[in-house]
């Protein structure tokens, strides 16, 4: 299946599985999606993820994280830069999500990273999405 915006598709799959309280969600893999999954893991939004070889690009299997009473670790996901309207931010205008409680995932010349790391590295880039 061909998808126009693979990152929006990934975020939608995670959002839907999260709202339905599923434990795992499978997403078609790509380098960028693997980098986003790694950031979600490092920031504590997911339990873990694994790459499953299917003979093509592979599949990312994400294990979602919930609290003791099934409270969601991910409250919201929002795609910012879209194929029809790219959104870029310089190093001095990187967004803060919910006053620092959430993260912005930025695609920079030094790779995909959070807004906090991009500020520390002193780089700007394309604002892919917000997670809170």
UniProtKB/Swiss-Prot annotation:
It comes from the Bacteria. SUPFAM superfamilies: Ribosomal protein S8. The lineage of its organism: Bacteria, Bacillati, Bacillota, Bacillota incertae sedis, Caldicellulosiruptorales. Belongs to the universal ribosomal protein uS8 family. Signal peptide: none annotated. This is Small ribosomal subunit protein uS8. Keywords: Ribonucleoprotein, Ribosomal protein, RNA-binding, rRNA-binding. The keyword Ribosomal protein applies. InterPro entries: Ribosomal_uS8, Ribosomal_uS8_CS, Ribosomal_uS8_sf. It holds the Pfam family Ribosomal_S8.
């Amino acid at each position: 299946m061909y998808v126009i915006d693979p990152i929006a598709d990934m975020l939608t799959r995670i959002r839907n599985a999260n709202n339905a309280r599923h434990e795992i969600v499978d997403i078609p893999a790509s380098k960028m999606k693997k980098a986003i999954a790694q950031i979600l893991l490092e920031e504590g939004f997911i339990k873990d993820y694994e790459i499953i070889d299917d003979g093509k690009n592979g599949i990312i299997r994400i294990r979602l994280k919930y609290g003791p009473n099934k409270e969601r670790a991910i409250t919201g996901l929002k795609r910012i830069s879209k194929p029809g309207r790219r959104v870029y931010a310089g190093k001095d205008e990187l967004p803060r999500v919910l006053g620092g409680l959430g993260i912005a995932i930025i695609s920079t010349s030094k790779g995909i990273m959070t807004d906090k790391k991009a500020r520390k590295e002193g780089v700007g880039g394309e604002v892919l999405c917000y997670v809170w």
